[in-house]
């Protein structure tokens, strides 16, 4: 038995489609609003916070490395997140209690590559781009 067809079936088709939409995972995620509540950024692209601690996270198999990360407490809601510090030796430019700007890393809501549970990356330290400090273009201000 297929879809009803013919005259006067529009209401039945429309109602059936409305009910079946809720079986679509992406539709549910967009319309329940729980994904926005669970997101530490609250729908924003970036968030600023204070560095709580510096840590190294072991890469997943088959890689063996210690990925340098920082724990950041966000200013907007007080949530603590783990953020990846890109480039070789950039962790040396970040101290505890520094202000950092954090952005998403890769796929929305998922960790990337071999770093388990890390969904964010550090973009700025003390309002200066981390890449600029790394390349020697700018110096980190001593505040």
From Swiss-Prot:
<comment type="similarity">
    <text>Belongs to the universal ribosomal protein uS12 family.</text>
</comment>
<dbReference type="Pfam" id="PF00164">
    <property type="entry name" value="Ribosom_S12_S23"/>
</dbReference>
<dbReference type="GO" id="GO:0003735">
    <property type="term" value="F:structural constituent of ribosome"/>
</dbReference>
<keyword id="KW-0379">Hydroxylation</keyword>
<protein>
    <recommendedName>
        <fullName>Small ribosomal subunit protein uS12</fullName>
    </recommendedName>
</protein>
<dbReference type="GO" id="GO:0005840">
    <property type="term" value="C:ribosome"/>
</dbReference>
<dbReference type="InterPro" id="IPR006032">
    <property type="entry name" value="Ribosomal_uS12"/>
</dbReference>
<feature type="modified residue" description="Hydroxyproline">
    <location>
        <position position="62"/>
    </location>
</feature>
<dbReference type="InterPro" id="IPR005680">
    <property type="entry name" value="Ribosomal_uS12_euk/arc"/>
</dbReference>
<dbReference type="InterPro" id="IPR012340">
    <property type="entry name" value="NA-bd_OB-fold"/>
</dbReference>
<dbReference type="GO" id="GO:0022627">
    <property type="term" value="C:cytosolic small ribosomal subunit"/>
</dbReference>
<keyword id="KW-0689">Ribosomal protein</keyword>
<keyword id="KW-0687">Ribonucleoprotein</keyword>
<dbReference type="GO" id="GO:0006412">
    <property type="term" value="P:translation"/>
</dbReference>
């Amino acid at each position: 038995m297929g879809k009803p067809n013919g005259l006067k079936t529009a209401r039945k088709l429309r109602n059936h489609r409305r009910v079946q939409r809720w079986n679509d995972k992406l539709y549910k995620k967009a319309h329940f609003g729980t994904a926005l509540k669970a997101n530490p950024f609250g729908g924003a692209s970036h968030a600023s916070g204070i560095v709580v601690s510096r840590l190294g996270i072991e890469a997943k198999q088959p890689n063996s490395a210690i990925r340098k990360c920082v724990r950041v407490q966000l200013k907007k809601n007080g949530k603590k997140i783990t953020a990846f510090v890109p480039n070789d030796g950039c962790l040396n430019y970040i101290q505890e209690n520094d202000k950092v700007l954090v952005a998403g890393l890769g796929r929305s809501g998922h960790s990337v590559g071999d770093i388990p549970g890390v969904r964010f990356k550090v973009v700025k330290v003390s309002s200066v781009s981390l890449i600029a400090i790394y390349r020697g273009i700018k110096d980190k201000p001593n505040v």
